[in-house]
Amino acid sequence: MIGDAMNQQASIRALAGKLGMSRQNFYKGRTARRKAEVEAELVEQLVRGERALQPRLGGRKLFKILVPVLENEGIRLGRDRFFDVLREKGLLVPPLPKSPGTTRFEPSLPVFHNLVAGLELTGPDQAWAADITYIRTDEGFLYLSLLTDMWSRKIVGFHVGESLETQGALFALAMALASLRGEARPVHHSDRGCQYASHQYVGKLKEAGLQISMTEELHCYENAMAERVNGILKQEYYLGSCFRKKKQAKAAVKEAVYLYNTRRPHKSLGYETPEKMHRAAA
């Protein structure tokens, strides 16, 4: 044992000599390398743990979530090093292709002017963005109706239906209306889809005292926030996958909306979550 230790010391002295450094500095370097390895292992474990909840959460948002945890362990890691670890461990998220839309325009139905273009929002419940997207299952398509607060980014209403009929959008609207506080009456913004232009839906908006706003062109750019939320749910929470059962898809939607609202930080919100921003402004 003593001989082995002496041989190891001799080997270290020889290696340090070849590298042009003292044995003490060699040990420091080895300790630093081991420290970096341990830090990388911890980052990997934390990222995989968060990705178990939010499978496609991007690197910047992961960094914002995990920095306090790392600092609590005495680890100060810059963003560049954090991304290096993600790259080394194969944890960067590749982009997914965009999905086709679900907008159906009916020329005989009423249309409204775009009231949110250039609108300066100062708090929640001032404007909502509405949209419908589809969910694939082996049992057929489902259709997800969403209403998102345009200031806090919180999903305030949602419903998964079996068809593109207006009823699904009405259920999401009812949920959103139930969340309103006090006398707040947001502008309701959507595309020109027949669900939102239907007499039944427009009547419900007017009955609730909401102003009606629509895109003035048949493209997604004037309803970019709603499209963005659709993309996040499909790409980061795998709602763009094909589910075996409709029941599974509905459960996945419910979980995705909860995680999006309560755990996903947004750059536009100073890396706070929609739920926190919405509640803090109450």
Where are these regions (language model features)?
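Mobile genetic element proteins and their domesticated derivatives, centered on retroelements
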Residues: L15-A16, F26, V47, L62, ...
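Active-site beta-loop-alpha junctions of metal-dependent nucleic acid enzymes
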Residues: G140, F158-G182, A197
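Basic, flexible linker segments flanking DNA-binding modules
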Residues: R23-G123, T273-A282
